[in-house]
Amino acid sequence: MKIEPITGSEAEAFHRMGSRAFERYNEFVDLLVGAGIADGQTVVDLCCGSGELEIILTSRFPSLNLVGVDLSEDMVRIARDYAAEQGKELEFRHGDAQSPAGMEDLLGKADLVVSRHAFHRLTRLPAGFDTMLRLVKPGGAILNVSFLHLSDFDEPGFRTWVRFLKERPWDAEMQVAWALAHYYAPRLQDYRDALAQAADETPVSEQRIWVDDQGYGVATVKCFARRAAA
Ligand SMILES: C[S@@+](CC[C@H](N)C(=O)[O-])C[C@H]1O[C@@H](n2cnc3c(N)ncnc32)[C@H](O)[C@@H]1O
């Protein structure tokens, strides 16, 4: 089963949810601040979805050179329209996070390459990390936060997840999408192996993979690495 791009009514539902719940991005923004994001930097957001993170980041760091990339034409269109509505000039590209095709101008140029809540959808996880490490400049950092497979949840974590799904006042479509996303998500060891494989091609000087919740009870995997200096 393929759950990669989010298209059609699911893309619209995702945008409705995301644009009404900016606080859900706070934890990720805090991680980016910890990773050293600063005004004037070049930042690439792989699997950017409908552009909520871009609106939040450019409000806080107005001179970021920020490029959002998504495999879904629908998401790219929604992100462009949303940015225009918000009076922002932002760049969104159609592209696959599993290949730098269409991002050649950014190879080795980004200070930070990020991805939020999407890498669990990739069919080729090592290729996703490979793209991140190729885009980032020597000494720059990558940060991915995505979902963990259900079998890696402990018992209380699983119960919290079920309660979260039931209680969340979402569109039914989003509830099913979330359940499927966790069902098809990689295991923690898959994340470790994928990052290690990518780091064989583009060496890293520092890396850390850890799991914690997002303050609303759902475990996510965090993957940070710094590309070795030239
Ligand atoms: C749950 S959304 C997250 C969007 C955004 N990062 C956020 O946090 O709001 C996952 C996004 O990943 C995109 N996606 C899935 N596979 C992709 C791939 N191989 N390359 C680029 N985007 C992809 C989907 O189209 C969707 O927009």
From Swiss-Prot:
Enzyme Commission number(s) from the entry: 2.1.1.-
Pfam families per record: Methyltransf_25
GO molecular function: methyltransferase activity
Keywords assigned: Antibiotic biosynthesis, Methyltransferase, S-adenosyl-L-methionine, Transferase
Keyword Transmembrane part of the UniProt annotation: no
Keyword Phosphoprotein: no
Domain of life: Bacteria
UniProt record, GO biological process: antibiotic biosynthetic process; methylation
InterPro entries per the UniProt record, alphabetical: Methyltransf_25 (IPR041698), SAM-dependent_MTases_sf (IPR029063)
First-level EC class: transferase
Pathway: Antibiotic biosynthesis
Function: Mediates C-methylation at the 8-position of the aminocoumarin moieties in coumermycin A1 in the biosynthetic pathway of coumermycin antibiotic. Active on both mono- and bis-amides for mono- and di-C-methylation adjacent to the phenolic hydroxyl before it is glycosylated by CouM.
Family from the record: Belongs to the methyltransferase superfamily.
Protein name as catalogued: C-methyltransferase CouO
Organism per entry: Streptomyces rishiriensis
